[in-house]
Regions:
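NTP/phosphate- and nucleic-acid-binding module
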Residues: 1-482
Length: 482
């Protein structure tokens, strides 16, 4: 029992070593395990269920916007990558290749999918003949492989799970509308479902997706001040259409190239969620994706235990039938206090306590994981009270994350200011940029910060470049990033 208690309580404090805290939490909360293959993790049931809830809600949103799911091969011929020069140059260092199969050397190497623009471009060239075939709105749920040198579970792994949308349109206007529509789907999902505030904006040319005309992103701030790119949406223009000869007969009877988009997000969202909301007690899971939303713990002496457990089971059935993801922990080999610590560490949003006196009074106690608030509620109003507390937990999580971001969002007019904000204060900084790639590269070299995006709604507009002092073309968010 002492060993179990140690397992629950010993988590490295965030202020002492944030990276160690993160690893402690995801391991102790049983979300993942390391595999024998470097950079690849095993999703354990609780970790994978979070991803399932993300998939379920995002699928709903994709289908509302007219998209359908499909699946494309994991293996991509090398010749496909050669057709789009920027694309292959962007991904080549990370590509694993299959060179043999069945004991024979392959005539052409096959890349293990890093993303599917090339394969899907090839298929679209076969499927699209006329304007009547457009738009094509397809999403794929898949695994992808990018051979990362430095890995971190959920946030940066050699193999990861994601969704990638790929669409084809008659013209630039429709394709750009799609690009921004899906960026907004991501923003609304991450803020409304994961309780993570994000900054939406356009990537600088050096940070664009390989082969894109324009890339847009949502950026989230972790509790160590670093950024995570939580989702991207790309306008690809006609680049892939030309490379893969995706032409259609227009309404005017002319052969035209389609305009394409792609957009994606991944299991990085799980890592982001943990880093944004977790604390020194462990995980703090947003209610809408938590595998268990309510943990029910019967308490009291042995002589009343049978009756308390029986009533707990009745309330469990009521909550479950109302669509609440609920569990009962009626173990007798650990104390209620130990259970309280365990489920706080696992991030369960709401705890329900029921004892013999509560039964007599027709009440039970609800406890919020975030605020620690205890609320005595009538059992005949339990469903309403639980749903209300779950919504309160979500709202409080969002407000806390937003407050943290506001407190760690700075403004820099000189390189010295930016260095100080990156090294000492740690967070995001707004700074002016002249548009020269060399200045952007120098900022990274001297401060370790990269441009996250050019925000659509900056808190202020900068007039001079932080690096060279020339007039600024853009106001940019800079931060160190995962």
């Amino acid at each position: 029992m002492a060993k179990d208690k140690q397992f629950v309580t010993e988590i490295t404090p965030q202020g002492e070593d944030f990276s160690r805290w993160y690893i402690d939490v995801i391991k102790k909360a049983d979300l993942m395990d390391y595999s024998p293959v470097r950079g690849c993790i095993v999703f354990k049931p609780d970790g994978f269920e979070i991803w399932e809830h993300i998939q379920e809600e995002m699928n709903r949103r994709f289908k509302e916007t007219g998209h359908r799911n499909a699946y494309f091969p994991l293996f991509i011929p090398e010749s496909f990558f050669q057709k789009e020069k920027e694309h292959v140059e962007g991904f080549n260092p990370e590509l694993p290749w299959v060179t043999e199969a069945g004991g024979d050397k392959l005539e052409e190497r096959l890349a293990i999918r890093p993303t599917s623009e090339t394969m899907i471009g090839h298929m679209y060239s076969k499927w699209i003949q006329s304007y009547r075939d457009l738009p094509v709105l397809i999403n794929q749920w898949a695994n992808v492989v990018r051979w990362e040198k430095r890995t971190l579970p959920f946030l940066r792994t050699s193999e990861f799970l994601w969704q990638e949308g790929h669409t084809a349109h008659e013209n630039e206007e429709e394709a750009r509308e799609e690009t921004m529509r899906m960026l907004e789907v991501y923003r609304d999902f991450v803020e409304g479902y994961l309780a993570i505030p994000v900054i939406t904006g356009q990537k600088t040319p050096s940070e664009r997706f390989a082969g894109a005309v324009d890339t847009f992103s949502i950026e989230a701030m972790m509790k160590d001040g670093r950024a995570v790119q939580a989702g991207t949406s790309h306008y690809l223009g006609t680049k892939f259409a030309v490379a893969f000869d995706i032409q259609y007969l227009s309404r005017e009877n002319n052969l035209e190239y389609v305009h394409t988009t792609s957009w994606g997000t991944s299991t990085r969202m799980i890592g982001s969620m943990i880093m944004v909301h977790g604390d020194d007690r462990g995980l703090a899971l947003p209610p809408k994706v938590a595998p268990t939303q309510v943990i029910m713990i019967p308490i009291g002496p042995p002589k009343t235990r049978e009756a308390v457990v029986a009533r707990t089971d009745e309330l469990f059935k009521e909550l479950k039938s109302a669509g609440v993801r609920v569990r009962v922990d009626d173990r007798t080999d650990v104390t209620p206090g130990w259970k309280f610590n365990e489920y706080e560490m696992r991030g369960v949003p709401v705890r329900l306590e029921l004892g013999p006196r509560d039964m007599e009074n027709g009440v039970c106690v609800l406890v919020s994981r975030i605020s620690g608030e205890k609320k005595v509620v009538q059992q005949d109003r339990l469903i309403e009270e639980v749903k209300e507390m779950l919504e309160q937990v979500h709202q409080e999580m969002y407000e806390r994350a937003l407050k943290f971001r506001e407190e760690h969002f700075y403004s820099a007019d000189t390189m010295d200011e930016l260095k100080n904000e990156m090294e000492e204060k740690r967070g995001f900084a707004l700074a002016g940029w002249c548009g020269d790639d060399a200045c952007e590269a120098k900022v990274k070299e001297e401060t370790g910060a990269t441009s996250r995006n050019i925000p659509f709604e900056p808190a202020e507009t900068k007039s001079t470049c932080i690096c060279c002092g020339k007039p600024a073309q853009h106001t940019v968010v800079f931060a160190k990033a995962y």
